[in-house]
Amino acid sequence: MKIRKQFLLLFISTSHLFVYAQNTEPSMFTKEANEQVVKSLPFENKQDFEDATRGFIATIDEPSIIDETGKEVYGLTVWDFLRQEAPASANPSLWRQGQLNRIHGLFEVLPGKIYQIRGFDLANMTFIRSDNGWIVIDVLLSKETALAGYNLLKKHVENLPVKAVIYTHPHVDHFAGIDAILENAPNKPETIEIIGPKGFFED
């Protein structure tokens, strides 16, 4: 419950920032600073958008990821306001980064070997095909978002046994979705090795 409250607060804060950006007239200093950002960076170069969409396989059809009771856990349309141009009160570089981050779904990173779930949560979930099954790196913030991504992999790639799960660090959005893997992998949970960095439980 604490995790979901933190997640909800993040969305509320983001929404408030957007409303503030839309309804607040920026100072001349802010306008000039943001105009300078436009002049100093190659915004006409769209290579990063090509990179962000390369290898796209599929995403879910639903506008949000829900839990067992039907409550929304993660809204995929909450970032749709980023489709428009950055308002004068927003840093255009950060706005563009947000546009890249809102791209979601299952992606093939290395053909036949590495796949990634993006935009379903605060972090990315990566699947590496080993000789005898999947190695999963980071399992997102919630069971629901991790399961949505895991189901995409099983549907569009392959439902292999999960041999190991790796937590890269102890931020909650990198480990809290573990039940989605343990409860839905074709092999028993006790056969899945979980690996974390030294001091994981101390941070």
Model-assigned labels for residue ranges:
Residues 1-8:
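Bacterial N-terminal signal peptides that target proteins for export
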Residues 8-9, 149:
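Generic structural signal for hydrophobic residues
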Residues 9-16:
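Bacterial N-terminal signal peptides
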Residues 17-21:
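Sec/Tat signal peptide C-region and signal peptidase I cleavage site
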Residues 22-99, 103:
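N-terminal pre-domain segments of enzymes
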Residues 99-160:
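Conserved beta-strand hairpin/beta-sheet module of binuclear metal-dependent hydrolase folds
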Residues 108-109, 195, 199-203:
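Metallo-beta-lactamase
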Residues 132-133, 143-196:
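Active-site metal-binding motif and surrounding structural segment of the metallo-beta-lactamase
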